Amino acid sequence: MAAEGPLTGRLALVSGASRGLGRATAVELAAAGAYVVCTARSTRTGATQTDVDDLTLEGTLDAVRAAGGDGEWHRCDHTEPDQVEALLRGVLDRHGRVDVLVNNAWGGHDHHEEADGEEVWDEPMEQFRAMLLGGAYSDYVTTLLTLRLAMGPARSGLVLTTTWHTPEPPAWVPYESSKAAKNRLVYALGYHLQDKGIGVVAVAPGWMRTELMEAHVAPEVLAGKTESPHLAGRVMAALAADPEVMRWTGQVVDVGELADHYEIDDLDGTRPHGNAGRYRPSPVPPPLPGEGG
């Protein structure tokens, strides 16, 4: 039996759900009662990351069920409109609704190339294109098709996008620019959907202890500077359950700010802002190659 909670009876679709923030979000939404449709490109017969065991959709669904929730998984490349439309039509045929969309797909680091030199103009041209496709474009495709087929006709729903607050001064040019495109898309969609009862919110976590980060970064580097991806997942579950979620629409909101607002702690009881023993994640580097979020 699925978990009972504030999202019972709701269906959430989470892209990029095979690992990291996507997996944690699927688990937290399911723990709050939602039926979760998990999508990504990585399966046990074709994993895109092998540095850590079972970073796959099947592994995510196992974690969802271990948390007392339920759902299903489907392999989908969210840069391909035909695949996304087929996915959504199948979900609607089986369940009749999509209440929450979490845009977490991110493929740009799969094409990571080191610059040949140290100057900004030495950056490979392909890098920015790959990040735009894996980030803002996949968000655009998935959101518009979800609006067209499900949320628009229902005049209800919530679109959540995982992103990054680009720093000042800016760092890695293709990464910062592609994240800025994601953020502006949220602002533009929020503006155009504000009178239709559909919220669009970007959620910006800090430096997360994902599976790949813990496998590649020394524990002493992570200590005191990081949060688990479950903190952002819990925040997104709270947003999905909030009847006044439209207060955040069109905005990029820091996970720490939302955790304070909803009084949510991380798995270890910490929170990015607030009382003694809590931390503020800084500085934050770009994700590891192949990492989502």
Residues of each region from the PLM?
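A glycine/serine/threonine-rich, flexible loop-to-helix segment
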Residues: 48-53, 116, 195, 205-227, ...
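Hydrophobic structural elements of the Rossmann-like NAD(P)H-binding subdomain
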Residues: 102, 160, 200-203, 213
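Short-chain dehydrogenase/reductase
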Residues: 1-95, 107-119, 126, 290
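Conserved Rossmann-fold SDR core element
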Residues: 29, 97, 183, 193-208, ...
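C-terminal helical subdomain
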Residues: 202, 219-293
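Catalytic loop of short-chain dehydrogenase/reductase
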Residues: 107-111, 119-131, 139-140, 148, ...
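Active-site loop of short-chain dehydrogenase/reductase
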Residues: 10, 69-70, 97-98, 150-163, ...
